[in-house]
């Protein structure tokens, strides 16, 4: 195996394929990258057995086919440490891989390519293409609601659901729920899968904001995304995701509208004097007015009064202020609508001008 490539052509692919690798691999070979040269292309693969990332780099200079695996971190650090515009010549000699550039020379240990674990072959059941920006929006709108190391393992991820011409993402940790739907202009079978938290983060990392469309394939146990020269595959979480439709408030009759930034700033200020552990704030809603109060064990108090659009019965309700702020930060809109029922029912929050995303936050007893 032998190839020569410019440093700039190798850095981004190396960075992307090193993404899935954990800090301390369970098997030594999982800390390595698989390098394969064939048909004028260098393929780089990194895996942690749950997901894999493959990058392809076109080789324009003379090369010889072959394959090996090398320590990912060291190879990346060497390439990154070389000067801009450097040419990197790589050659396999016995059990060592030689890396040369200018007057620098490195000899890396290798492990046989045949020992590198590949994800099993699988058949895709649903396939579609969408703009990167659409996928980015779907993930950004909901990922903050994913659970983190919950014993209900199926909550440590994101539900991807196809229905009609829409792709939907849903995330919940049992206290709050986020759902976002976007039309993708293709008629799709009804199908839903749970992508693990780490897979969602890697999928987000591979979106570079370019014009290259994203091609998605979903199988019974795997999801794969292709964009440009990168292919990302992740195993799915096996479990039943809660039905988000049953979580949305049935018929909330009290609607409050207010400026998103105004609300965000008021909640952020009130949060300063909320209980550090429970983060509770109390909302008092009356005719065109919202009062937010918070206090803590030191008996310090915060009060914010805002002009809002509201006509309905007066009520009070408590929330974890962190959950409300997460929603307001994700909304990025001008005005928000809060749909309330009573003091013991969840609130639904959405962009007043769009219904593509909805957020549900459970109340707190204060």
UniProtKB/Swiss-Prot annotation:
Name of the protein described by the UniProt record: Beta sliding clamp
Additional notes on this entry: The temperature- and UV-sensitive allele dnaN159 does not grow at temperatures higher than 37 degrees Celsius. The global SOS response is chronically induced. The UV-sensitivity of dnaN159 is dependent upon Pol IV (dinB), it has an enhanced Pol V-dependent mutation rate (umuC, umuD), and is absolutely dependent on the polymerase activity of Pol I (polA) for viability.
Main location: cytoplasm
Function description: Confers DNA tethering and processivity to DNA polymerases and other proteins. Acts as a clamp, forming a ring around DNA (a reaction catalyzed by the clamp-loading complex) which diffuses in an ATP-independent manner freely and bidirectionally along dsDNA. DNA bound in the ring is bent 22 degrees, in solution primed DNA is bound more tightly than dsDNA, suggesting the clamp binds both ss- and dsDNA. In a complex of DNA with this protein, alpha, epsilon and tau subunits however the DNA is only slightly bent.
Region (3), start-end ranges: 245-365
GO CC annotation: cytosol; DNA polymerase III complex; Hda-beta clamp complex; replication inhibiting complex; replisome
Induction of expression: Part of the dnaA-dnaN-recF-gyrB operon, but also transcribed from at least 3 promoters within the upstream dnaA gene, induced at 42 degrees Celsius. Induced 1.5-fold by hydroxyurea. A shorter isoform, beta* is induced by UV treatment and also at low levels in late logarithmic/early stationary phase growth (at protein level). Beta* transcription induced by naldixic acid.
Organism encoding this protein: Escherichia coli (strain K12)
Coiled coil region boundaries: none
Gene: dnaN
Effect of residue 133 to T: Reduction of synthesis of beta*, probably due to mutation of its promoter
């Amino acid at each position: 195996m032998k190839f020569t490539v410019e440093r700039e052509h190798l850095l981004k692919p190396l960075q992307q394929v090193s993404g899935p690798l954990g800090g301390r691999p369970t098997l030594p070979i999982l800390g390595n990258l698989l390098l394969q040269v064939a048909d004028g292309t260098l393929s780089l693969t990194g895996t942690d057995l749950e997901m894999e990332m493959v990058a392809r780099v076109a080789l324009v200079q003379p090369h010889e086919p072959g394959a090996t695996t090398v320590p990912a971190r060291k190879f990346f650090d060497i390439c990154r440490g070389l000067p801009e515009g450097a040419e990197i010549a790589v050659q396999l000699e016995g059990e060592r891989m030689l890396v040369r550039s200018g007057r620098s020379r490195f000899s890396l240990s290798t492990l046989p390519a045949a020992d590198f674990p590949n994800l099993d072959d699988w058949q895709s059941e649903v396939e579609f293409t969408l703009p990167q920006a659409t996928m980015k929006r779907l993930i950004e709108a909901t990922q903050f609601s994913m659970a983190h190391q919950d014993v209900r393992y199926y909550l440590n991820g994101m539900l991807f659901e196809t229905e009609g011409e829409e792709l939907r993402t849903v995330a919940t940790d049992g206290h709050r729920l986020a759902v976002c739907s976007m039309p993708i202009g293709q008629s799709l079978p009804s199908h839903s899968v749970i992508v693990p938290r780490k897979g969602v983060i890697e999928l987000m990392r591979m979106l570079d904001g370019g014009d290259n469309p994203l091609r998605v394939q979903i199988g019974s146990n795997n999801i794969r995304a292709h964009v440009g020269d990168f292919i990302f595959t992740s195993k799915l979480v096996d479990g039943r995701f809660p039905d988000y439709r049953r979580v949305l408030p049935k018929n909330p009759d009290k609607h409050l509208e207010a400026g998103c930034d105004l609300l965000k700033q008021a909640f952020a200020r009130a949060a300063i004097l909320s209980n550090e552990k429970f983060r509770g704030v109390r909302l008092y809603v009356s005719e065109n007015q919202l009062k937010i109060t918070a206090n803590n064990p030191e008996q310090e108090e915060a009060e914010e009064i805002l002009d809002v659009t509201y006509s309905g019965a007066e009520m009070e309700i408590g929330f974890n202020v962190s959950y409300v702020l997460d929603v307001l930060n994700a909304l990025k809109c001008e005005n928000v609508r809060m749909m309330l029922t009573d003091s013991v029912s969840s609130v639904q929050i959405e962009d007043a001008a769009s219904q593509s995303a909805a957020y549900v936050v459970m109340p707190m007893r204060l």
